[in-house]
Amino acid sequence: MAIVALGVVYGDIGTSPLYTAQTFLAGQGGLGSVDREAVLGMLSLVFWSITLITTVKYVLIAMRIDNNGEGGIFALYSLIRKYGAWLAIPAMLGGAAFLADSVLTPAVSISSAVEGLQTLPPLEGLFDENPSLTLMITVVIIVILFSVQSRGTESIGKVFGSMVLVWFGFLAIVGVTNLSNDWSVFEALNPVYGIKFLFSPNNAAGIALMGTVFLSTTGAEALYSDMGHVGRGNIYFTWPFIKVALVLNYFGQGAWMLANSDNPQYTAMESLNPFFQMMSPNVRYLAVILSVSAGVIASQALITGAFTMVSEATRLNWMPHLQVRYPARTRGQLYIPVVNGVLCVSTLAVLAIFKDSEHISAAYGLALTITMITTTVLLGVYLWHSGKRVGAIVFTVLFLAIQAMFFIASMAKFLHGGWFTMLLTAAILFVMYTWNEGTKLERAQRRHMRPNDFLPALDKLHSDFRIPYFADNIVYLTSDSETKRLDTDIFFSIFADHPKRARAWWAVSVETTDEPFTREYSVEDFGTNYIYRVRFRLGFKVSQSIPAYIHQIMHDLSKTGELPKQKSIYPKVDADPDIGTIRYVLIHKALMPESKVSARGALSLQAKYAIRHMAGSPVKWFGLAPYNPLVEVQPLFVSTRRPPRLKRTDTAKTIPTPTPTRAVADPAAVPDPMDTTSGLGRLVQELDAAVSAEARKTAEAAAADAPAEQGDKGDKGKAENGKPAAKPQRSAKQKR
């Protein structure tokens, strides 16, 4: 599993040496413009940024704070949201920024690595004649990468893990090779060098230098987000090796820059990349191959992190329910087809807009600084409420100060492409906010009825033979977690317009557990044999095939006598003659012109319903399509007050009452069907009594066929003192 950790979580931070030093030289005016002070200052800032941000903040502190093994900003928010509603704001903002960064990482990592092919002498002419060749190769690699995601990160991680192990070993060896000529660069371990150069007049980039240094820490947030995929212990075990390899390579590049700062061959070179130039031409071939592989792996780290984050956002009701697959046996390794497709299309769009890594890197990093800042805020709140208040203050002040410098420096990228990531962040944030607000508004109108309120009406409808059956069984799918009461939406659906009479009504909800293969259900029958509240508890790897489970429950209850016997005379989709017809009903909320809701609330609801329409339907999620489910729309926030009466403007016509052709009795003498003193009334009463008697006979026959209770409960059925014992009562809730 440690090899999987290498492949899944370290790809992003492992590609930073490809472009960090190159970006530093570009900001300082080239290799000829830097001196020893500049090189040591840059190395010092890089080393301490990796140490403080990645090692201290994420590896040593953040990873100790998990939600059932899951990491990331949403998992962290789930732990502390009880401390204030305002915490949703930084959590949403940080999550949106992370997802926006997930679009840019594959584009910048893979394109920058592929462009290394241009440094190989035999291929220089080919790329000069075909400038778009690099872009085409990058597109092919990205399409292949997203296509293999459905195989799961376990299989991908094993392959990528071995490659990353070779990659970081290669980084360390190349770094040591160049360090052997000048070990003095380790003076940069002194943080004074970094602070001094940052504020030195020789720093041509000014505060923007911190934006370059920040590139060395990209991937740190992915360590925390991907913790659920590979486990905290595996990251602890592998991180020391990763950090040593990174430091050796950065310092090796620094030693090469000091050794060649006066070499005209390199000082005149545009877009000089010390990473490739510090190697001999023969080694450079291997470097290009490995760097392309590392770029692919870096993309993998962000893709898996995006899957995890969207899954957590769904559980928080910040995003719509999406189809989730679990290719491996652990819940942390998941695959979301819709997210995979959106990321793929968005990444290709980035390549189409920015063309090459130079322009993509101008937009890269700004969104990630926002994620790191919001994570710091949430971690500080967690530490504060954990009783470590002094530590919380020190932690929050220190890391907010550092990351504020990163953010200010990265804002210089806004006009050079940073606007794109901000646009993506705003779009994702809009989805989260509107979905959350829309859900809150829907739940604000949700009401529940106690059994004493709904049972009399249902009992009357159940025994009213004058109304034909809508179906033998009507199954309502609901997201309501209440099991002791009934959602009024279901009650109104049953009685709206033409009442939906049935032999049995079912209200069904699904709860996904953290265990992979849980298959349980509980039933509440409210003391009747015609209404059942069912709650499924299904493991995250168990298929949510509701029709199959509903049939099992009906058979189970029929065998115990809790559900009256049913027989299907005509052919059905499920071909199950022992169960009557089943009709599934889904209730969707909708705004109406007369809905009484604020403009902001209406916007949130309309946006939510538009997103829901694009995200898919529960009909597909639960396999209901073959059963022709009924989708009902119920209005939100509609006033029950009658509108003012209309005024008629034309002249009303008086229609004379027709004269009867034969004498009729006085209306007062016409028997009332509900008047038991009249013949018709007595007939209706007799018919009702017959129906009730038939219902009692059916219930008694079903009870007689039911198997006797086992164990201690069976003893209660024995006679005492020659008198039959009372019939044992069924518990309100049974767990299967």
From Swiss-Prot:
Return the annotated region ranges for Disordered. Answer: 649-678, 693-736
Tell me a Gene Ontology molecular-function term this record carries. Answer: symporter activity
List where the protein spans the membrane.
Answer: 1-21, 42-62, 84-104, 126-146, 156-176, 204-224, 239-259, 287-307, 334-354, 364-384, 390-410, 414-434
Q: Report which superkingdom the organism of origin falls in.
A: Bacteria
Reaction equations catalysed: K(+)(in) + H(+)(in) = K(+)(out) + H(+)(out)
Quote the Pfam families the UniProt record gives.
K_trans, K_trans_C
- Stretches of Basic and acidic residues bias are at 710-721
Membrane topology designation: Multi-pass membrane protein
What is stated as this protein's family in its record? Belongs to the HAK/KUP transporter (TC 2.A.72) family.
- Presence of keyword Transmembrane helix: yes
* One GO location term (cellular component): plasma membrane
Task: Summarize the protein's role.
Answer: Transport of potassium into the cell. Likely operates as a K(+):H(+) symporter.
Location within or outside the cell: Cell membrane
Mostly located where?
membrane
Q: Where is the composition biased (Low complexity)?
A: 660-677, 700-709
Which keywords are on file for this protein?
Answer: Cell membrane, Ion transport, Membrane, Potassium, Potassium transport, Symport, Transmembrane, Transmembrane helix, Transport
Q: Which InterPro entries match?
A: K+_transporter, K_trans_C, K_trans_N, Kup
Q: What is this protein called?
A: Probable potassium transport system protein Kup 2
